[in-house]
Curated annotation (Swiss-Prot):
Gene: yghB
Organism for this UniProt entry: Escherichia coli (strain K12)
Cellular compartments annotated: Cell inner membrane
Signal peptide as annotated in the record: none
Source domain of life: Bacteria
Family: Belongs to the DedA family.
This protein's UniProt keywords: Cell inner membrane, Cell membrane, Membrane, Transmembrane, Transmembrane helix
A Pfam short name: VTT_dom
Name of the protein described by the UniProt record: Inner membrane protein YghB
Effect of loss of the gene: Double mutants lacking both yghB and yqjA show incomplete cell division, temperature sensitivity and altered phospholipid levels. They are also hypersensitive to several compounds known to be exported by other drug efflux proteins, including ethidium bromide, methyl viologen, acriflavine and beta-lactam antibiotics. Expression of either yghB or yqjA can restore the wild-type phenotype, suggesting that these proteins have redundant functions. Both individual null mutant strains grow normally at all temperatures.
Amino acid sequence: MAVIQDIIAALWQHDFAALADPHIVSVVYFVMFATLFLENGLLPASFLPGDSLLILAGALIAQGVMDFLPTIAILTAAASLGCWLSYIQGRWLGNTKTVKGWLAQLPAKYHQRATCMFDRHGLLALLAGRFLAFVRTLLPTMAGISGLPNRRFQFFNWLSGLLWVSVVTSFGYALSMIPFVKRHEDQVMTFLMILPIALLTAGLLGTLFVVIKKKYCNA
């Protein structure tokens, strides 16, 4: 718990030297890994802020806190392993009450979008779906339910994971290198730190609202 407090304090104070400490940066990697794994792997956790976290990772790379290639490798593994977990849920637990309940709690627009993409493009939908919140968690579950072979799924899973992590993280890095952004570095880093928290809160409240609304309507 003390390490988490140190990380938050270092981010808030923009103390990148402290964040670059091997012990602290390993915890940062762990938190990012866990967040991406859960967001990609569990439907109830699909509200977690994966995109904004990758942008923050790119900004931290630009500040010398983390290295580019290890970050891409670690976060790609997190996203792809999480996506595999989502596929397994659909393949082996798709007909269970629990998974059906999770699917029912997702906003209808995301379910319709994922269904349309999967029906039209099959596994190729994973490449574009990775860049859409909620959809990237839902598509692997649908692939598992449809009975698609694991070998075919894994190819598109890891390819789309690498593409998503590389593009969004590189965007965060490039954004941090823009002269205007560099001149307002403190404000930008504060924004990038607050953004995932704000999105997490909004996603959690939105999910709770949908759950309560559906329970009220079914009562």
